């Protein structure tokens, strides 16, 4: 089977190759014999019989139907011929004053060039009219002489050169010269012999080459052309234009032939080479995406005024005096490890651990927490609003949570106005910090009981207390109108991760909540806006104030060690994630609206179908009632007059009524 398929494939391939070769030969043949169509135009006049029937032909040629034209008996025409009315052709006398516009004059000169250029060339070459007519007669009889084209001459020359080529010595040029010299020596002899033959038949088809003419010959040509209605200089100018047009046509034809040669399935490489050859001399500018590199986020230089005003808040690189040391977090949760990491970070940043911090200034950060202030103020400068400050605090707290407990940073870095589960997690961290900072708080008192008692609480009560404590923060920031919504939102569900983290017992969760509350109280006590602090925090007792002052240095060290600077790529990633979340919510909302709309349309369609079915049933019922009434009328009429005449009709109507009564519509 495989051999048969191979044989068939080989046969097909051979047929295709033969067809291609045949088409190539046919194309070459037609290219050879192709000429100007005007050269094939020949007009011949002969006497012939129009009618095949001899009787009809004799009747048509009888003197009754034929008449001499212009009195010439040798030239007989039909009397219905239109030439019978051309007995007298009046001579044309042009008007003396001719007003011709410049456009008409230029058109007339062009027409004269097309009419008489052959005669002008014959006059210039000294060829008489008899010689020209004889040459035309010879061409009509035998056709034009086939002269080898320039391409064929080049091919023959290449073949001759390749025969004389040797690899031992480079004598190719000499061989070519030797091969060309006999040709040049032979050519004058050939020309002499040809000239002897062409004395009788001069070659008048050779067009005058304008580029080879000198000034005298050009002037002579133009002078010869003026006798044929052309202006001085028109003939040579139009000859040049014709030559340029012929060159352009030849070039376009060569291009098309090259393209046709490269057509086919296997000629992709040849087409590419042809395209590269065409575009080799052209200069191509690089595309826009290759012209510039991707942006680099190196620290850029700033003006002295900007750097002096924002050096504390915007500087990313550490000063040469205090270079930061990179500390790697290797363990989570232990208080000893946290204290050691905080001490290492404080030593690296150059802060004295035993030195108490100065009171916070509203204009700038405290000196005891330079590292944390430097990192925090990169995301929120002193000129930004309080809302952006709170968002940067939440992002810093989420990163602290990532380093402490190994949670995913993105799930905590969202603002609590984004989604409900994230708002519950965020309010939980807020409420924990608030419970440890506010001694007189009711929720904090309830939450700070023993671990066993706390784990025994119902989930609803726990979520309610948590939502209330988070709601107090919301009330301080936004107003009292969010209490019911956050209470209802947070009381109906608890995420598994949240319930797991709440039921987890031991010193790890307590120390984590303690460190969170300390960092939260420290960040709120160092907030640069005093009115926000008044809104969000009630008045605390002096003991709580002392506790806060004691915990401030440790919290500053922790934030300085555990809060990294966000790179622009990470910032862009966060922004893209937020945009994706927004788009997801919008798509979800649009899908819900679409589903509601489809449901509404379905209900409307069902109602319409129900109404249509009801109408159809009513019409059917009315039709049945009409038929029944008609039948009863007919039956009563027949029962009144039971004559034998109507007995057949009566029986047929009875039969019809019986069949109708059997149908389900007429059952009583």
Swiss-Prot record:
Metal-binding is among the record's keywords: no
Modified sites of kind Phosphothreonine: 327, 567
Protein family (similarity comment): Belongs to the splicing factor SR family.
Processing and modification events after translation: Phosphorylated in vitro by CLK4.
Source organism per UniProt: Rattus norvegicus (Rat)
Keywords attached to this entry: Coiled coil, mRNA processing, mRNA splicing, Nucleus, Phosphoprotein
Subcellular location: Nucleus
Biased composition (Acidic residues): 182-214
GO biological process, one term: RNA splicing
Compositional bias (Basic and acidic residues): 290-313, 436-446, 584-611, 619-635
SMART domains for this protein: DRY_EERY (SM01141)
Protein name: CLK4-associating serine/arginine rich protein
């Amino acid at each position: 089977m495989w051999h048969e398929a191979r044989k068939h494939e080989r046969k097909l391939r051979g047929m295709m190759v033969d067809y291609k070769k045949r088409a190539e030969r046919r194309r070459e043949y037609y290219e050879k014999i192709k000429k100007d169509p005007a050269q094939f135009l020949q007009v011949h006049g002969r006497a012939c019989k129009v009618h095949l029937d001899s009787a009809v032909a004799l009747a048509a040629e009888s003197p009754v139907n034929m008449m001499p034209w212009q009195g010439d008996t040798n030239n007989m025409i039909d009397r219905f011929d239109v030439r019978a009315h051309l007995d007298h052709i009046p001579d044309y006398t042009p008007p003396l004053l001719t007003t011709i516009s410049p456009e008409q004059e230029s058109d007339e000169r062009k027409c004269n060039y097309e009419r008489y250029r052959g005669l002008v060339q014959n006059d210039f070459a000294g060829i008489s009219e008899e010689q020209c007519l004889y040459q035309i007669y010879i061409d009509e009889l035998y056709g034009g002489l086939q002269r080898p084209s320039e391409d064929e001459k080049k091919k023959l020359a290449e073949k001759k050169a390749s025969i004389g080529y040797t690899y031992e010595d480079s004598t190719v040029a000499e061989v070519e010269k030797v091969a060309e010299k006999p040709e040049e020596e032979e050519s004058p002899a050939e020309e002499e012999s040809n000239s002897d033959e062409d004395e009788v038949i001069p070659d008048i088809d050779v067009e005058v080459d304008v580029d080879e003419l000198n000034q005298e010959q050009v002037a002579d040509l133009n002078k010869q052309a003026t006798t044929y209605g052309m202006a001085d200089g028109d003939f040579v100018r139009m000859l040049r234009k014709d030559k340029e047009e012929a060159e352009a046509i030849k070039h376009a034809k060569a291009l098309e032939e090259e393209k046709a040669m490269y057509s086919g399935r296997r000629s992709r490489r040849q087409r590419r080479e042809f395209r590269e050859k065409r575009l080799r001399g052209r200069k191509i500018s690089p595309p826009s995406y290759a012209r510039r590199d991707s942006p680099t986020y190196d620290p850029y230089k700033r003006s002295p005024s900007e750097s002096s005003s924002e050096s504390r808040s915007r500087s990313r690189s550490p000063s040469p005096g205090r270079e930061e040391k990179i500390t790697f977090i290797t363990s989570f949760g232990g208080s000893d490890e946290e204290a050691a990491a905080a001490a290492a970070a404080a030593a690296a940043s150059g802060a004295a651990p035993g030195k108490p911090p100065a009171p916070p200034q509203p204009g700038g950060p405290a000196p005891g927490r330079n590292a944390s202030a430097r990192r925090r103020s990169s995301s929120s400068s002193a000129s930004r609003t309080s809302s952006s400050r709170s968002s940067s605090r939440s992002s810093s707290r989420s990163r602290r949570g990532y380093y402490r407990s190994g949670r995913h940073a993105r799930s905590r870095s969202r603002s609590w106005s984004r989604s409900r589960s994230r708002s519950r997690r965020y309010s939980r961290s807020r409420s924990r910090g608030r419970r440890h900072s506010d001694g007189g708080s009711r929720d904090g008192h309830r939450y700070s009981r023993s671990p066993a008692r706390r784990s025994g609480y119902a989930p609803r009560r726990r979520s309610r207390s948590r939502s209330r404590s988070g709601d107090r923060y919301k009330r301080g920031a936004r107003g009292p109108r969010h209490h019911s919504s956050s209470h209802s939102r947070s009381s109906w569900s608890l995420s598994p991760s949240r319930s797991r983290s709440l039921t987890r017992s031991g010193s790890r969760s307590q120390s984590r909540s303690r460190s969170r509350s300390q960092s939260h109280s420290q960040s709120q006590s160092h907030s640069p806006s005093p009115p926000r602090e008044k809104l969000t925090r009630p008045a605390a007792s002096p003991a709580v104030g002392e506790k806060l002052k004691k915990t401030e240095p440790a919290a500053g060290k922790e934030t300085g060690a555990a809060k990294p600077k966000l790179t622009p790529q990470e910032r862009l990633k966060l922004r893209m994630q937020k945009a994706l979340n927004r788009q997801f919510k919008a798509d979800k909302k649009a899908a819900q609206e679409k589903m509601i709309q489809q449901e509404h349309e379905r209900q409307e369609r069902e109602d319409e179908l129900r109404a249509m079915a009801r109408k159809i049933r009513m019409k059917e019922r009315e039709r049945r009632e009409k038929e029944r009434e008609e039948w009863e009328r007919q039956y009563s009429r027949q029962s009144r007059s039971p004559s034998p005449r109507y007995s057949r009709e009566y029986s047929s109507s009875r039969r019809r009524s019986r069949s109708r009564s059997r149908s389900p519509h007429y059952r009583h």
